[in-house]
């Protein structure tokens, strides 16, 4: 079982970034629109890069179609 974090996603952002709001709580801005899973894929890519893990280890547990998501890393 890996690290679980709460993430609020901001799609269509000018700049992609990860901001830690509190322990295990993040706000992630992605440049992609929330259409056809593009923002979710961008979220996985950004979090994998931020935490230094493979993309395959980052999973969306809850909130596939919502801005507030539960992510498992590892």
Where are the predicted features?
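N-terminal first-folded block
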Residues: 1-29
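Short secondary-structure boundary micro-motifs
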Residues: 1-4, 11, 34-36, 43, ...
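C-terminal structural segments of small proteins and small subunits
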Residues: 4, 44-74
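Arg/Lys-rich, often Gly-containing low-complexity segments of ribosomal proteins
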Residues: 12-13, 33-36, 40, 62-67
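Compact, glycine-rich, soluble single-domain proteins
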Residues: 21-51
